[in-house]
UniProtKB/Swiss-Prot annotation:
The gene is Spock3. GO terms for cellular component: extracellular region. It comes from the Eukaryota. This is Testican-3. Residues 399-430 have a biased composition (Acidic residues). Residues 314-380 form the Thyroglobulin type-1 domain. It comes from Mus musculus.
Length: 436
């Protein structure tokens, strides 16, 4: 009896082993416990990164869904081979460095950022993750067509109007077309200038270029602040450009400089400046950046960057007076510091605050000369131009080591540094031809 029982146990064990082996073979052959959803497997999530390769560099200022967000395989392949449902379209798709390829269906490959992919997963128990679906499932995808780039109101370039509308749908915000072509939008005058016609640019045209670039940087800065949470910069603190020492660079200009300065040396070389797209028709844009390079060393320092834009602003003293009048309205506030302007709208060398009885010396752009503030009338016989006018060939070199903020600041509150926002989308920029 015991022998019969033992024999039955051995047979039962063998039958169970064969059954499990057969079930495993069926599963390997194509049977799936997840209902066919390949994204439910953790193994897939670790292997899709093999498609995350890109030849060359990626423009850091492009949106995640724009510029061929829906990628396709090589159109030179035979038609029947390209549409073979047995082949993974991601095998023939190259995504940017910070994106991965996923298969939307048998014929559509989709490049999506790591961040969006992570946000589309939710924890279900332990370490198992369940796919919730693409964030753009309700947004209409764009057909494959020739690129017709447009510049969006968020400061980003899109390969077509459809890509712009798709981006707006994915992000759930309003994005309109600012102009045809890539950002920044050219002026009306530059559209009528031939490609091969060389001419000198006027001061007015330089000012228009600076204003357009400043508006573009502001749109990028605000767009980045709205889309991402602020994160601390992973860079040496002493290598960062302290924008508080130069008020003109405390906002978007300083933010853009830190974005472009990828090696943190406080100098922009040709490869770093190449991240800014230049319209071939806008000859004055190239000339503008050439004018910023005071030392003619093919490098733009943080000082040169800030003062180059500062020179192209409206007369600073008149601008400050207008701002004061707008803030206080009809009533004049007691104790308010009122700057003294010359006939051209720039600051006079001697500035005084009658309420506190102090005077100090400034350059024509209103930057205070360190150590010149005294009680009483200051001796500012020299026309200071060192910090704003590089034409003099001399200027004061600011460094991050100098903690002279209390002496530099006027009778105003301290200016707080803007939060830097260089999160997950700090991709490598496309390298264009240098223009210096």
């Amino acid at each position: 009896m015991l022998k019969v029982s033992a024999l039955l146990c051995v047979c039962a064990a063998a039958w169970c082993s064969q059954t499990l082996a057969a079930a495993a073979a069926v599963a390997v052959a194509g049977g799936r416990s997840d209902g066919g959803n390949f994204l439910d497997e953790k193994q897939w999530l670790t292997t899709i990164s093999q498609y995350d390769k890109e030849v060359g560099q990626w423009n850091k200022f492009r949106d995640e869904v724009e510029d061929d967000y829906f990628r396709t395989w090589n159109p030179g392949k035979p038609f029947d081979q390209a549409l073979d449902p047995a082949k993974d379209p991601c095998l023939k798709t190259k995504c940017s460095r910070h994106k991965v390829c996923i298969t939307q269906d048998a014929q559509t490959a989709l490049c999506i950022s790591h961040r969006r992919l992570t946000h589309s997963m939710k924890e279900v128990g332990g370490s198992h993750k369940q796919w919730r679906g693409l964030p753009s499932s309700t947004c209409k995808p764009c057909p494959i067509a020739y690129a017709s780039p447009v510049c969006g109101s968020d400061g980003h370039s899109y390969s077509s109007q459809c890509k712009l509308e798709y981006q707006a749908c994915v992000l759930g915000k309003q994005i309109s077309i600012k102009c045809e072509g890539r950002c920044p939008c050219p002026s009306d005058k530059s559209m009528n200038i031939g490609r091969n016609v060389k001419r000198a640019c006027s001061d007015l045209e330089f000012r228009e270029v600076a204003n357009r670039l400043r508006d573009w940087f502001k749109a990028l800065h605000e767009s980045g602040s709205q889309n991402k949470k602020t994160k601390a910069l992973l860079r040496p603190e002493r290598s960062r450009f302290d924008t508080s020492i130069l008020p003109i660079c405390k906002d978007s200009l300083g933010w853009m400089f830190n974005r472009l300065d990828t090696n943190y040396d406080l100098l922009l070389d040709q490869s770093e400046l190449g991240s800014i797209y230049l319209d071939k028709n806008e000859q004055c844009t190239k000339a503008f950046f050439n004018s910023c390079d005071t030392y003619k060393d093919s490098l733009i320092s943080n000082n040169e960057w800030c003062y180059c834009f500062q020179r192209q602003q409206d007369p600073p003293c008149h601008t400050e007076l207008s701002n004061i009048q707008k803030r206080q309205g009809i009533k004049k506030l007691l104790g308010q510091y009122i700057p003294l302007c010359d006939e051209d709208g720039y600051y006079k060398p001697t500035q005084c605050h009658g309420s506190v009885g102090q005077c100090w010396c400034v350059d024509r752009y209103g930057n205070e000369v360190v150590g010149s503030r005294i009680n009483g009338v200051a001796d500012c016989a020299i026309d200071f131009e060192i910090s704003g006018d590089f034409a003099s060939g001399d200027f004061r070199e600011w460094t991050d080591d100098e903690g002279e903020e209390d002496d530099i600041m006027n009778d105003k509150d301290d200016i707080e540094d803007d939060d830097e926002d260089e999160g997950d989308d700090d991709d490598d920029g496309d390298v264009h031809d240098g223009y210096i």
